[in-house]
Amino acid sequence: MSEEVIIDIIKGDEPQAIKPQENLIIYGVNGKPITGRTPNQKKLVEAFAKNDLTFALGPAGSGKTYVAIALAVKALKNKEVKKIILSRPAVEAGEKLGFLPGDMKDKIDPYLQPLYDALQDMIPAVKLKEYMETNVIQIAPLAFMRGRTLSDAVIILDEAQNTTTHQIKMFLTRLGMNAKMIVTGDMTQIDLPASQTSGLVQAIGILKNVEGIARVEFNKKDIVRHKLVQRIVEAYEKHDEKVRKASMSKKHEQAEKKGEE
């Protein structure tokens, strides 16, 4: 790390525009380099550089959102964009905003806390507060994006598997000039009612051959949390596969019985 970067961190200021270095995205507030640690994290870094819209798909703990936010912070620090916009659909685990206590900020914050946590790792507290107060960094639920054109920005939609088909189309068509989007999601964690199609699932199918759009698939090998998390994910994958096979077997038996009648 350069002497200039260390001085900036001690003073609570941002490091100056980041010089290219292998695998480095940015330095965190503690001076620790934030890099693409796994092959798929590195693919996300490359995809972001080459495309205006990137889908990052995979399990919890694989670093897809953290790396996406680091890329946005780097673009802001290097003055490639003027703002960062982070969003999530405000429906998770069966909860809706209308049923949460408190005023709007109190209702929204629990959904957006993971995004705050990542930013706090990357931007000194005083500077982050300034960015938030001046709307250089904006964090809002997806519904707040309607009617806006998002230019000169990096825009990240997290937990996109919980968008409806209308919501994700609305979000993707907000893209303005000199802007890039990263859409993250985990197809195995859809919390929408069973009758609703995930907007992310539909969008991936519709946009798979569109120029300027990339798709990066993460997997359990990318999980960078506690090593137990990877084993938990593997156990659930095995369980889900058993359930899927049992369901297929039952359907096959029912079809055979109908054929005999």
Regions found by a protein language model. Give the residues of each.
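Conserved helicase motor core of SF1/SF2 NTP-dependent helicases
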Residues: 29-157, 161-261
